[in-house]
Amino acid sequence: MSSSVTPTKYVLNSFNSVPRLSYAKSIDIKDSLTDLIKIQRDSYNAFIGVGQNTESGIKNIFESMFPIEDLLGRAVLEFVSYSIGEPQYDEYECIKRGITFSVPIRIVLRFIVWKVQEVSFKEVKYVVDEETSEKSIKYIKEQEVSIGDLPTMTPHGTFIINGIERVIVSQMHRSPGVFFDSDKGKTYSSGKLIYSARIIPYRGSWLDFEFDIKDILYFRIDRKRKLPVSLLLRALGLSNNDILNTFYDKIRYVKCEKGWIVPFVVDRFRGVRLSHDLVDVNGNVLVKANTRITLRMAKKLANDGLTEYLVPFAEIQGLFIANDLFDPSGNALIISAGENITSEHINKLELFDIKEIFVLNIDFLTVGPYILNTLFLDKNVTYEDALFEIYKVLRSGESPSLDTIKAFFDGLFFEKERYDLSTVGRIKLNDHLGLNVSEDITVLTKDDIIHVIKKLVLLRDGEGSVDDIDHLGNRRVRSVGEFIENQFRIGILRLERMIMDYMSSVNFDNAMPCDFVNPKILATVLKDFFSSSQLSQFMDQTNPLSEVTHKRRLSALGPGGLTRERAGFEVRDVHPTHYGRICPIETPEGQNIGLISSLAIYARINKHGFIESPYRKVDKGVVTDKVEYLLAMQESNYYIADASATLDENNQFVDDMLYCRHDGNFVMVKREEVDYIDVSPKQIVSVAASLIPFLENNDANRALMGSNMQRQAVPLLKADAPLIGTGMESIVAAGSGTVVLAKRGGIVHRVDGLYIVIRAFDQEKNEYLGVDVYNLRKFQRSNHNTCINQRPLVKPGDYVKANDVIADGSAIDQGELALGKNVLVAFMSWQGYNFEDSIVISSEVVKKDVFTSIHIEEFECVVRDTTLGPEKIMRSVPDINEDSLSHLDDVGIVNIGAEVSAGDILVGKVTPRPPISLPPETKLLVTIFGEKVFDCVDSSLYLPLDVEGTVVDVHVFVRRGVEENDRSLLIKQNEINGFIKERDYEIDVVSEYFYDELKRVLVNSGVQCNNQNVNDYLESTPKKDWWNVNLSDETVLLQINNLREKFDSMIQNAHSKFDQKIDKLNYGYDLPQGVLCIVKVFVAVKHNLQPGDKMSGRHGNKGVISRIVPVEDMPYLEDGTPVDIILNSLGVPSRMNVGQILETHFGWASVNLGKKIGHILDNIDELTISHLRNFLDQVYDGQDLKYNIQSMSDEDLLAFAERLRGGVPMAAPVFEGPKDSQISNLLKLADLDVSGQVDLYDGRIGEKFDRKVTVGYIYMLKLHHLVDDKIHARSVGPYGLVTQQPLGGKSHFGGQRFGEMECWALQAYGAAYTLQEMLTVKSDDIVGRVKIYESIIKGDSNFECGIPESFNVMVKELRSLCLDVALKQDKDFLSSEVNN
């Protein structure tokens, strides 16, 4: 297949990434990829009602709660409308201030008080309006009331809670509805299948049905004690006859001279062995006794005209009567409904000459007597008895009235206030049971319960199959909007109860709507959810990919979900319905494996919470461009071909027969029968997995590790996009929110390190839209202490389109995701230093800061008001010399840009202490020499021991009402200057445009301006006076006035925004009680690569750096180029991640093609430009780009080729990577050996290695498992209180313990005294270790060992088991024991 290039049309701009040479042949649904966090945003918008056709979740909650009437009906509180305000601060200001990014919610309430004549406990007599005959209104009060603040979503799909960016993870849970299941024969040793059914509501009580080993059907409510299902049916109002008639068909038996005449029904004879001859009504024998009748035979008999047959009189014995049967007089009961007909009953039928009976259609083969048997367990139970039995199980110990019990039972399943199936549950119930109940009815009905029981009985009879609970048709996704809606509902219900309580005690004459509402109630509920819910998580902000993945994560854990301890293998496993919906690769490796997963790349979630996957429609063997999204339930009905199916130029299948997916299986069908085809081979994987080139060549376990480790990659000092990508890099970068995207198209007006100013302009309409000013984030700290830094890509004069990348973020290069570096790798062993996945690195890599990363550490100093007086920030800290304060300013706060190291003071602070009494001689010396006596102690903020770096930012927050220090005033002034600059930028752009427009209008009009020529007037008059020109032409004046209005409006808008920002800045800061000031210092720490750091490729090939080798000792190529990294070749075969080898070859070709292009450029002339053009045609062997290359000007061609010097960027999309032959062709084109191997020379002795080595370029990542964060040493530190042994871990400043296996080692060497020391004085012998410390100080080498504390702990535990253990100190006793 010939390669193609994406994007197809290349426009040479400085901010464009170089197009990748791609081998993909499938189409991409660009619309699905432009917004990777659509699921988060759409869910939240549906809740608040933004951009939705349906009503918002907030409005529905308010309408379900209101109106609220007081208990006596004297007044009512009605809901009118609601409004959502604007946030007080933007998201970055909220992070800076440590507050929640939220919007105020206000509702308009109407309080109506009725005129009443008389009020009693029983009733209220209202004053009735004579005209309308309705209750008269005493007065109406309407008011807008605040009910609290709602945390709002940022444009990036996150929430900022108390200054921390958080993500609400979507949850996979069992969909509301009915589910049928079996125990798969595991409950009883006989292996008998026990069937059950469960009705799960969205909110309310669960209803279970289950058979037991005796085939009696029971039910449970909320997993309480089980009861016979006949009790539930009677509680629903059904009598015994009703129950039998509902669940069983009747068969009519008519008596004649020869026996009973019975209708012939084909299904009743299927597979039946006749106990007697089958005789028609005329006495003809149709089938002999002991014959097994097949379905075909039964149908033939029916077709031959058999409608009735004869049964001998005695054969009705054992059948079940359908109705109560009375004698002809109607007084005596012969047989009760449901009873088994016995010989005695047959005699009675003869005696009373009964001509016709009806029996139940129970044949014990296709229809069993399960309901009948259950009914006979408690045949004489009445409706009231059934209700009492159910109530007794659910509310034991109570004895209420019958009315109370009825109300309680109705509330369980039939009232909206306590039970809610939700729309999804009703749809699932209708679909499962074949009902046609309206979706608005979200409570259970009597028919629902009866149909569930019927289907469960059919399952027991062998008809149908149980549900697969892991099928995605039975699992749905709850996203952020649904979670917040549920919490909002809880808060509003609490508010409702409070309002009703208040109504019962308030004087209505003086009450206003605001008196009823306490805004703290809703705020408390929402705060608890966002702060402590298992699904509200601290956002993984290590790099842009980790952010995107976290927002697209699906968790089966959390409230209402599974627990990792009880989750079995089935729920964790990959299911066929996950195809195109949930990634089968990306999941954690630990105990959460399979419970946490990621949404597939093209998947979307519909309004009911079910995951849909896109497919291209196939019409009579021709693949169309129409894309349809299918649910897992719908997909099983169609034949779906794989995206790799070969198509001709007319998009028709080449092969007559194709493998297709159908109902969870792979089948071979004709091409005309195919309904759909996959849109892309990569639609089955997640975003992270789609970034792995040659994924199809890797083992699944290693692909899982590769997906997970990309999320752990640390952004490097200089981002470098991979030479070998997959084509997804730019899409992930744009969707991550890390880059800056142009809101509107326009022309770049000004660019600097902090701002990009764009004059928004619509080229098609030739219309000016305004000014967009973009603030760039500089050296800000992420949640994981990585550095967020945005760099502009555009330059003044560039034209940008909407959604163009105009500034890179961290780990972004030219708008493409860049998590690591392209480095030269050799696969070989080297002196044993790359044993067991260890990695050998060249010192040149460290020297050039290839893998150096910047981390921002935050340190906080809090100034409090103490009982002895306020703490103070000051430079003159007691007992600190001047040299240690040199990097502090006059206030006592470190300067930005200062180089600080361990132990340096960042903020000088003193805390008052109680005054101390000085002796007289000291007082005299103080008086004589004028020395200060400090009544305070040093409480400064010091830099921790393991940190060294540069101060990049300082924030000072002073409590409102407290006098600000000079540093905080300076910081505030700098912020104001930034606002002024931003305002001036906007005004400059607006002024430039409108003055140009005004000049164009005046010049084109050709009129005299103030009796002067237009050009002369404009040159001699200041621009601000141009508006005051005197003209006689009314048309021109009208145009000028319109321009003036727009100009003044935009200028006024710029000043208004500036004033708002200044007001917010001057408002001050709300700090916690007792806090006067908070100083935050941000230190940038540079982490160079060093032994112990963890590195990885994208194929799960991880390792730890074992040694940094001098560059002169590293193996080198024939041209003298030393390799950067040496990997162990034994790490490939057993791991089966061959993708890294293919990436190495592909990268080797890419870089050498770039070198060849660079060589042509170095010797460029008119002849070689043609040669360069032809060579690029060969490299980009695709028609789309070939046309562009041939049509490029020489200047553009040279600029394009110049950007290929470092290597030709290539894409190996998932499951569509280049074949071996294509890689070989590129190696040949680059004048390389097609084996991909080269001769290497030993850098230490200069000799060539015995055989060729695989060398090439691979994309390596530095992971956030840095040795600086892990290495730890301790001499003295904290001990455990009970065992008196050192604590464990770096966070506790712990140490290592001498454990059981270490004791074995000393025992093996017979080192008894060393072992005694290790277990006593060097460990937890409290007295002994103090004594040995004293002896060391004294220079004495003698010591005694005591009893270790761990032995005392063991003795205490034995005593707790009532074993009295005592130690005897008698030396004579010990010697006698030894002698014995």
Swiss-Prot record:
Family assignment from sequence similarity: Belongs to the RNA polymerase beta chain family.
GO terms for MF: DNA binding; DNA-directed RNA polymerase activity; ribonucleoside binding
Record-listed E.C. numbers: 2.7.7.6
Catalytic reaction equation(s): RNA(n) + a ribonucleoside 5'-triphosphate = RNA(n+1) + diphosphate
One GO CC annotation: DNA-directed RNA polymerase complex
Keywords tagged on the record: DNA-directed RNA polymerase, Nucleotidyltransferase, Transcription, Transferase
SUPFAM superfamilies: beta and beta-prime subunits of DNA dependent RNA-polymerase
Transmembrane segment boundaries: none
Swiss-Prot/TrEMBL GO biological process terms: DNA-templated transcription
Pfam families assigned to the protein according to its UniProt record, in alphabetical order: RNA_pol_Rpb2_1 (PF04563), RNA_pol_Rpb2_2 (PF04561), RNA_pol_Rpb2_3 (PF04565), RNA_pol_Rpb2_45 (PF10385), RNA_pol_Rpb2_6 (PF00562), RNA_pol_Rpb2_7 (PF04560)
Subunit structure: The RNAP catalytic core consists of 2 alpha, 1 beta, 1 beta' and 1 omega subunit. When a sigma factor is associated with the core the holoenzyme is formed, which can initiate transcription.
Function of the protein: DNA-dependent RNA polymerase catalyzes the transcription of DNA into RNA using the four ribonucleoside triphosphates as substrates.
Record carries keyword Nucleotidyltransferase: yes
The protein's name: DNA-directed RNA polymerase subunit beta
